[in-house]
Amino acid sequence: LSRLSNEKRPFPSGLDVMAVFGSQRAEELLDSLYNPSKEWDGYKKEYNEVKSEFDERSIKDKTGNIYTTWLYSLESLNQRFPEGYPNFMRNKAWESKSLATALGSWAELRHDTILYGAQSSVECGGEEEEPPKVTGYVEPNPEFYNRLIWLTKQTMEGLSQRNGISDSMKEKCENIIELLE
């Protein structure tokens, strides 16, 4: 993705990232609001090459570690939903909402990776009373939830192999998996 930058654009934008990951809405916004080709003649060629490389990644490449699996999970937010899904999920407003969700998560992942890559672990939590369970609407996006399950399992396995997960944290991860299933 760093190839989508030059002296005028020192970093690829979040819209570049999400467009490469398949968001048609991100592509539309890039073209209509920013039009990077206007300031950089080689942008479209470079973009198409990077997108082609990303599209050709194997599932093993997409899920080789926690970072790439997280990105793979976000890719599922970029889909356009076919007939049969609720109408409110099949319009531009929904695509914009999903794009904002993916961009927010990507920004947090990038932030954590850059700033906290070598962070030491800290014990969290206390003896507080559990809050009441809240019920609400769950978006019918099974692909995203399946990828989150995969990400959670991969995280647990990686931490277990390094003796970096306590029994209580493992139980919390299993609860997350159960909730997502």
Task: For the regions a language model picked out, list residue spans one by one.
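Polar/charged low-complexity regulatory segments
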Residues: L1-E181
